[in-house]
Swiss-Prot record:
Record GO biological process: acetyl-CoA biosynthetic process from acetate
Protein's recorded name: Acetyl-coenzyme A synthetase
Binding site for CoA: R191, A192, G193, R194, T311, N335, S523, R584
Family: Belongs to the ATP-dependent AMP-binding enzyme family.
Gene field: acsA
EC supergroup of this enzyme: ligase
GO molecular function: acetate-CoA ligase activity; AMP binding; ATP binding; metal ion binding
Organism: Shewanella pealeana (strain ATCC 700345 / ANG-SQ1)
Length: 650
């Protein structure tokens, strides 16, 4: 298949890379054979207040599960992102901020960011926040979001960042679960030209009858818009900062003390609070950031993720700042007001490393490469992809149009639960294949198992599990350790179950086939939906595709494809048949879609993830009880898909 084409490491990257292929293999082998020794060495890449002597104490036994790393050491995450850089790099840019409107620009040096964080840490203390308290952060993409997180870490409070697109009900459930004492927000946010009513959403969330834990709401003035004000509860960020001291000694935290909570989106039932602790997480975030992106001193690094997602935590705040990087933060979306915005920002800020999501790449691809005719891109050296498997066609477009065929692409696979990247190419070490996450990071032992838990060897496919712990791993589900054990360690005993399916090819490269519940069983054959989607998107008239299974009288499950065409393409029955033949040719007769529904848009969360549970229900003609759609960017998309569905009962 065309997906097997190999892209060699560019010679100019190989010449200066942190590790080459031989070094990767040697380091990886050491990390698996001698994890104690390996992580003892690399655990010292960050600053410890009391150095650790104990490295690893972990068990994946579901009757006696525990995960501890560097567990007798003490440190502070904020000090590792700020104080350690002050002696030599106080004047170096830590943050470059560009607003939704490109005319809004701000910068903060490491010295300035340190001062802001210390002041806000003292402000939090003045409002009664103490070590171990949970603070909810519901902010736009402004530097103050990072300041709030680092200030919490400085005083030992646990931050719980909620994505600024979430509904009041979603906020309320997270505030209740975390028992938050203080909420930090802004009057309004600005995103793609639209005003986001952040404070109004908080007011509504806190009016929920079960929310009785919040004592204070700190409000940053972003737009100056009119907002409701609750005397005695609400307080302006600015007025707190006016009187706060710039001196704040970082709290000495145990390596296993909590750093943050982050609730996984899209899960059914109660929100699942993923708990990450301080020591192992900081080591892993910093190390993966440096090695996966081959980070060099003085480079400008842009991760387009929102701070409300794990990618924003690990690869916009903690990892890059621990490494002393200059981080670009963008308030808006990289294809507003025009698709050219991404390229304009890369050129304007001389971005060296770009980390973005397949959903954005596909959106830009649908607009056409002529949008990038004025794009120079000469500053770019490394490009990354995150969030979901990237279609080979989108990978190639990213490589050709954005990377000008000179930038290695690191297609990273990981999860909220893993804290950092688990499987990814390393720019100077790994020849890449479009659509493959390739090889495991140091210390990570992936395996494939069949449905009863037997490990399958060689070129094969199955359920993706991890056989041993790594420092960035989540420690528990907040307040519900039994749920942690049940979700991740009961399905396959003694292994961490990722919930993803994967294929390993003859070179040992891993291909993520999607969530296991995104596997279709057609006439007894397992088929990853990502594979069918990739084939559809490879057609020149297809901008995006989502594939699900639906009940089929003969096959058990049939293949139902939702297809969005490129601009200007016409939806015809001839094209529908052409696409069916196209997939048949690309993958085989088994993968031919039974039904292809034209879709002007797909139901996505505001982070761009397709909400497949809605698509599965519509395909199954179960349209009366679709469940909560509050996390969707555009709920109206659902109504249109229901109206135009193909699998109606007669």
């Amino acid at each position: 298949m065309s997906t097997q084409s190999l892209y060699k490491v560019p010679s100019e990257i190989a010449a200066n890379a942190l590790v080459n292929d031989e070094q990767y293999k040697k380091m990886y082998q050491e990390s698996i054979v001698n994890p104690e020794g390996f992580w003892r060495e690399h655990g010292n890449r960050i600053d410890w207040i009391k150095p650790f002597t104990k490295v690893k104490k972990t068990s994946f036994d579901d009757h006696n599960l525990f995960i501890k790393w560097f567990y007798d050491g003490t440190l502070n995450a904020s000090a590792n992102c700020l104080d350690r850089h002050l002696e030599n790099n106080a004047d170096k840019l830590a943050i470059i901020w560009e607003g939704d409107d490109a005319k809004d620009q701000r910068t903060l040096t490491y010295g300035q960011l340190h001062a802001e964080v210390c002041k806000f840490a003292n402000a939090l203390r003045s409002q009664g926040v103490r070590r171990g308290d949970v603070v909810t952060v519901y902010m736009p993409m402004v530097p103050e979001a990072a300041v709030a997180m680092l200030a919490c870490a400085r005083i030992g409070a646990i931050h719980s960042v909620v994505f600024g697109g979430f509904s009041p009900d979603s906020i309320a459930s997270r505030v209740i679960d975390g028992n938050s004492k203080v909420v930090i927000t802004a009057d309004e946010g600005v995103r793609a030209g639209r005003i986001i009513p952040l404070k109004a959403n908080i007011d509504e969330a806190l009016s929920h009858p079960d929310v009785n834990c919040v004592e204070k709401v700190i409000v940053m003035k972003r737009t100056g818009g009119d907002i409701n004000w609750v005397e005695g509860r609400d307080i302006w960020w600015g007025s707190l900062m006016e009187t706060a001291s710039e001196h704040c000694i970082p709290e000495e935290m145990g390596a296993e003390d909590p750093l943050f909570l982050l609730y996984t989106s899209g899960s059914t039932g109660n929100p699942k609070g993923v708990l990450h602790t301080t020591g192992g997480y900081m080591v892993y975030a910093a190390m993966t950031h440096e090695y996966v992106f081959d980070y060099k001193e003085n480079e400008v690094y842009w991760c387009t993720a929102d701070v409300g997602w794990i990618t924003g935590h690990s690869y916009m705040v903690y990892g890059p700042l621990a490494n002393g990087a200059t981080v670009l933060i963008h308030e808006g979306v990289p294809n507003y007001p025009t698709p050219a915005r991404l390229g304009e920002m890369v050129d304007r800020h001389k971005v060296n490393i770009l980390y973005t999501a397949p959903t954005l790449i596909r959106a830009l691809m649908a607009e056409g490469k002529e949008q990038f005719e004025g794009f120079d891109g000469s500053s770019l050296r490394i490009m990354g992809s995150v969030g979901e498997p990237i279609n080979p066609e989108a990978w190639r477009w990213y490589n050709d149009v954005i990377g000008h065929e000179k930038c290695p692409i690191v297609d990273t696979w990981w999860q909220t639960e893993t804290g950092g990247i688990l499987i990814s190419p390393l720019p100077g070490a790994t020849d890449t294949k479009p659509g493959s996450a390739t090889r495991p990071f140091f210390g990570v032992q992936p395996a494939l198992v069949d449905n009863i838990g037997n490990i399958v060897e060689g070129a094969n496919e199955g359920n993706l599990v991890i056989l041993d712990s790594w420092p960035g791993q989540m420690r528990t589900v907040f307040g519900d350790h039994d749920r942690f054990v049940l979700t991740y360690f009961k399905t396959f005993r003694g292994m961490y179950f990722t919930g993803d399916g994967a294929r390993r090819d003859e070179d040992g490269y891993y291909w993520i086939t999607g969530r296991v519940d995104d596997v279709i069983n057609v006439s007894g054959h397992r088929l990853g939906t990502a594979e069918v989607e990739s084939a559809l998107v490879a057609h020149e008239l297809v901008a995006e595709a989502a594939v699900v299974g639906y009940p089929h009288d003969i096959k058990g499950q049939g293949i139902y494809a939702y297809v969005t065409l490129t601009k200007g393409s016409v939806e015809t029955e001839e094209l529908r048949q052409e696409l069916r033949q196209w997939v048949r040719k690309e993958i085989g007769a088994l993968a031919t879609p039974d039904l292809i529904q034209w879709a002007g848009g797909l139901p996505k969360t505001r982070s761009g993830k397709i909400m497949r549970r809605f698509l599965r229900k519509i395909a199954a003609n179960e349209v009366t009880n679709l469940g909560d759609s509050s996390t969707l960017a555009d709920p109206a998309v659902i109504d249109t898909l229901i109206e135009t569905r193909l699998n109606r009962s007669e």
